[in-house]
Swiss-Prot record:
Organism: Xanthomonas campestris pv. campestris (strain ATCC 33913 / DSM 3586 / NCPPB 528 / LMG 568 / P 25)
Stretches the record annotates as Disordered: 526-546
GO CC term, one of those recorded: GroEL-GroES complex
Gene: groEL
Similarity comment: Belongs to the chaperonin (HSP60) family.
Protein name: Chaperonin GroEL
């Protein structure tokens, strides 16, 4: 086992705080509408230019192991806030730095670290309750657009496109972000349920222009096994032909005689049919077929539940207003399922999302919710260079997370104002002893830090602006973008409550751990062994000419 380097007490905390300051100073430069850019070197290719706090934090590794431990712990604050709320990483870092710096000073002055931590925790608890009281629900598209704009560093086009996407696919809908091919941002919306399986034969195509098979008001047969014998399908085909409607067959596989018969019937115009493979594999396939059944008001024909294909009737089939089948995708639009049943199914899947620990499973379950709840929107980010594209895509993803958080827990006035307003609730607290009260005071000063940093980045004097904001009430604050004072909600400067809350709670959590740290252990630096001296010539061979 390698030897360890151990530091205690003040020496350990000083080094740790030094690391915190290095990371926080780099990250906080990006805060606010007038935040600066940070350039990140890449091991290959052009450097990345970003105003995203978590991207900056992730790049930082320090040479001194003890300083690096401090930096890594604050990096954890940024990452955790990003995971919880999708934004607020820079705010969380600024709060953590303020709490740790003041806390370390208090410990150096001889105060009890545990009492300081208790005081900070008490203050944060009161501040979170006050934030929830200040919070207003997000209902209209305008508020959603404003939240997106602020999170995307005041880029209105990003805020508007996110609001439009949410309007089209609903609050539960899946919105994904991709790199586009043009200069402008584009929104592509797929309504209804789409899955990545196309027609099994090109003879099913009935729309030559789009090279797709379009079915209006079709019946939908869902089966979880292979269909190779046409006799099994006859009762269903006869029923559909009598009704004079087209038919979509979704099964594990349609092959051989069954597929040939369907193609012949379609070409002759006897019955319009399209066959596609069921999406997914194994249990996921069964679950997706069940989702389709709920969406279309049909039943999955499965021997597991005692339903045989040859016994199926037209009553077991689902319905939809329209189905479009291309070479690669099938889209079911406006299924005839009962809305209460669909909602119950969505609730069931959401419970599974909460229970799963796998990110992959969670993503797939969220996709299923979206397909049942309304559709999928794809935001295609446009830019003129690859560097700009990467930076813009990161901002769009941040803004999207922030708007989701706003829909979830509501919004508070932005620009650091919400934390300043929460000071009132914290200011009335007193601790069980003097050290705890000092912990509360540390939290009070730290909660001013985000506003101070936004103002400093805008080139103004933080204390002057802060005092003026404190004199106001409610949404009154400072718009750093144009230097005006006024109602932050009217200015459109809003922060999701979840983002501000997560930033404060995560910062306090790490600060509490660091203040109460008394020893640090790291691998001792290895001393390089001197290289062996170069060997001379062989003895007894003098005089030989080499």
């Amino acid at each position: 086992m390698a030897a360890k380097d151990i530091r205690f007490g003040e020496d350990a905390r000083t080094r740790m705080v030094r690391g915190v300051n290095v990371l926080a100073n780099a990250v906080k430069a990006t805060l606010g509408p007038k935040g600066r850019n940070v350039v990140l070197e890449k091991s290959f290719g052009a450097p990345t230019i970003t105003k995203d706090g978590v991207s900056v934090a992730k790049e930082i590794e320090l040479a001194d192991k003890f300083e690096n431990m401090g930096a890594q712990m604050v990096k954890e604050v940024a990452s955790k806030t990003n995971d919880n709320a999708g934004d607020g990483t820079t705010t969380a870092t600024v709060l953590a730095q303020a709490l740790i710096r003041e806390g370390a000073k208090a410990v150096a002055a001889g105060m009890n670290p545990m009492d300081l931590k208790r005081g900070i925790d008490q203050a944060v608890k009161a501040a979170v309750i006050e934030l929830k009281n200040i919070s207003k629900p997000t209902t209209d598209d305008k508020a959603i657009a404003q939240v997106g704009t602020i999170s995307a560093n005041s880029d209105e086009s990003i805020g508007n496109i996110i609001a439009e996407a949410m309007q089209k696919v609903g609050k539960e809908g899946v919105i994904t972000v991709e790199e586009g091919s043009g200069l402008e941002n584009e929104l592509d919306v797929v309504e209804g349920m789409q899955f990545d399986r196309g027609y099994l034969s090109p003879y099913f195509i009935n729309n030559q222009q789009s090279q797709s098979a379009d079915l209006d008001d079709p019946f939908i047969l869902l089966h979880d096994k292979k269909i190779s014998n046409v006799r099994d399908l006859l009762p269903v085909l006869e029923g559909v032909a009598k009704a004079g409607k087209p038919l979509l067959i979704v099964a594990e596989e349609v092959e051989g005689e069954a597929l040939a018969t369907l193609v012949v019937n379609t070409i002759r115009g006897i019955v319009k049919v399209v066959a596609v493979k069921a999406p997914g594999f194994g249990d996921r396939r069964k679950a997706m077929l069940e989702d389709m059944a709920v969406l279309t008001g049909g039943t999955v024909i499965s021997e597991e539940v005692g339903l045989a294909l040859e016994k199926a009737t037209i009553k077991d089939l689902g319905r939809a207003k329209k189905v479009q089948v291309s070479k690669e995708n099938t889209t079911i639009i406006d299924g005839a399922g009962d809305s209460a049943t669909i909602e119950a199914r969505v609730g069931q899947i959401k419970t599974q999302i909460e229970d799963t620990s796998s990110d992959y499973d969670r993503e797939k379950l969220q996709e299923r919710v979206a397909k049942l709840a309304g559709g999928v929107a794809v935001i295609k980010v446009g830019a003129s260079t690859e560097i700009e594209m990467k930076e813009k895509k990161a901002r769009v993803e941040d803004a999207l997370h922030a708007t989701r958080a706003a829909v979830e827990e509501g919004v508070v006035p932005g620009g650091g104002v919400a934390l300043v307003r929460a000071l009132v609730a914290v200011g009335n607290l007193t601790g069980a002893n003097e050290d705890q009260t000092h912990g509360i005071q540390i939290a009070l000063r730290a909660m001013e830090a985000p506003l101070r940093e936004i103002v400093a980045n805008a080139g103004e004097e933080p204390s002057v602006i802060l005092n003026k904001v404190k004199e106001g009430t409610g949404n009154y604050g400072y718009n750093a973008a144009n230097g005006e004072f006024g109602d932050m909600v009217e200015f459109g400067i809003l922060d999701p409550t979840k983002v501000t809350r997560s930033a404060l709670q995560n910062a306090a959590s790490i600060a509490g751990l660091m203040i109460t740290t008394e020893a640090m252990v790291a691998d001792a630096p290895k001393k390089d062994e001197p290289a062996m001296p170069a060997g001379g010539g062989m003895g007894g061979m003098g005089g030989m000419d080499f």
